[in-house]
Amino acid sequence: MASVAQPVRRRPKDRKKQILDQAVGLFIERGFHSVKLEDIAEAAGVTARALYRHYDNKQALLAEAIRTGQDQYQSARRLTEGETEPTPRPLNADLEDLIAAAVASRALTVLWQREARYLNEDDRTAVRRRINAIVAGMRDSVLLEVPDLSPQHSELRAWAVSSTLTSLGRHSLSLPGEELKKLLYQACMAAARTPPVCELPPLPAGDAARDEADVLFSRYETLLAAGARLFRAQGYPAVNTSEIGKGAGIAGPGLYRSFSSKQAILDALIRRLDEWRCLECIRALRANQQAAQRLRGLVQGHVRISLDAPDLVAVSVTELSHASVEVRDGYLRNQGDREAVWIDLIGKLVPATSVAQGRLLVAAAISFIEDVARTWHLTRYAGVADEISGLALAILTSGAGNLLRA
């Protein structure tokens, strides 16, 4: 009896993309440090050996995912025939394509904001170079839209545009397609066209270092500062208590007189930011009765804390998933309550703004504030808090033609 020939199983042409897609999903869901190559291979339905044909290691997968997302932004600036570099165009001409890139790559944005520190030095440098190129392109477009802005003012407005677009990667909120595009367009243009609030002279060198040394008045504060700095730089899973103690200048068991574990330090950091945010919310509501003044006060409070404690803000953005369930859930619940106050005030000031639209605008404004606070060189100017507040208010009230320019 003749044997029946078995059909030849051919390797899918897009296997490399399938592997990358599965890796992206796992990195976003669990965090880079918690995903193993075996997990990615299993999710993609391939063997580990097959995965290695396409990617050398987990870092190579992460680098490719981040590059893919950033390339979508860079390719949004169109080339005309014969060009090797795109000619800058006013923001209103490029914005439709930038919004399309933001929507298409929203799942990838979180990777370059949260996970890029796990790349090797060469890949991290490439990520920073591409981010700088993206923002520089937006700055050129802003200057063509609003001539005569200073370098500092134009760069902040470019970051406002960039953060508004990339804020989509920090949440799962959405709107119907055209409504979302219109909201993003109005918010970006409102920020770009916001007149300068004040001059931005450079701060004296060394001020920040002196301020930091002055506030570390106790073992507790020193350990919190060291923990926040290390968690931000290396990621919570990669840091141990010995490193925190060393970073704080505290040897051996001295750390445990203040904290029982690394987990306790992270939880204390998240609780602290939560309580500070709540206090600023209370202050803004007590000090003001009018909706416009209340919203301005809320924004100014958020800016103040973000500039005062950038490491703390960074930890809340990148390490929240590692906090204990009780602390994480409490933080998210309180954050939702605080943002509901912002949304209610936006609705009073701009009645045409729906609750769903308000949520997206609040997410965009907060993303901008926290992105700037975590970008050192942008914060080294006197008056930058007022400038950030004015731009955030422009985003929040963009449905009303910049009602609350500060």
Curated annotation (Swiss-Prot):
Keyword set, alphabetical order: DNA-binding, Lipid degradation, Lipid metabolism, Repeat, Repressor, Transcription, Transcription regulation
One family name in Pfam for this protein: TetR_N
Annotated region of DNA binding: 36-55, 240-259
Source taxon at top rank: Bacteria
One Gene Ontology MF term: transcription cis-regulatory region binding
Ranges for domain HTH tetR-type: 13-73, 217-277
Keyword rRNA-binding: no
Disruption phenotype: Cells lacking this gene result in a significant increase in the expression of mce3 either in vitro or in a murine cell macrophages line.
Residue pairs linked by disulfide bridges in the UniProt entry: none
Protein name, entry field: Transcriptional repressor Mce3R
Function of the protein: Mce3R represses the transcription of mce3 operon and down-regulates its own expression, but does not affect the transcription of mce1, mce2 and mce4 operons.
Gene: mce3R
One of the GO biological process terms: lipid catabolic process
SUPFAM superfamilies: Homeodomain-like
PANTHER family recorded: HTH-TYPE TRANSCRIPTIONAL REGULATOR RUTR, TRANSCRIPTIONAL REPRESSOR MCE3R
KW Calcium (keyword) present: no
Residues annotated as transmembrane: none
Induction info: Negatively autoregulated.
